[in-house]
């Protein structure tokens, strides 16, 4: 069983000469069975050469075998600009690869040991990023900042009203945590049946 971690830093991320700030990414892949992981990489490398549109049976089986080893994946990106930071944290620990039974029985949460997604974004940093992107559309800085402020404030307002986001002073946050069989969004419990129904509708819409 292997644990691995990496940190990547990009100083001065630019798009068409526009400075979006500095990006750092902390990643980890823990509780990994080395042999199974090597098989997974080999199968997907071979499949990439064939350019299949859909997953092959071999890919499905090796993916399930890998997930059944209960790996943990951590992905924490942070973007910093002159106004502040935009940070998020994704931490997923798998428990089972029996997707068919889990979805069929409405036991979605049983697939995970835990699932954590958190976001903490400085509002001024959000506006700064949005304004920089809008300036790529040839808006001047003043107009871009005005539009960015309106868009960000409206997005935050709608997110707060829907219970997706929480305003905390100068920051906006999102906290989605699944632990011990209970899913909470910003502290509010989301029933497993509701999640199962949403996933079912999503799968049905993708099949059309």
Where are the predicted features?
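Glycine-rich, small/hydroxylated-residue low-complexity segments
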Residues: 1-208
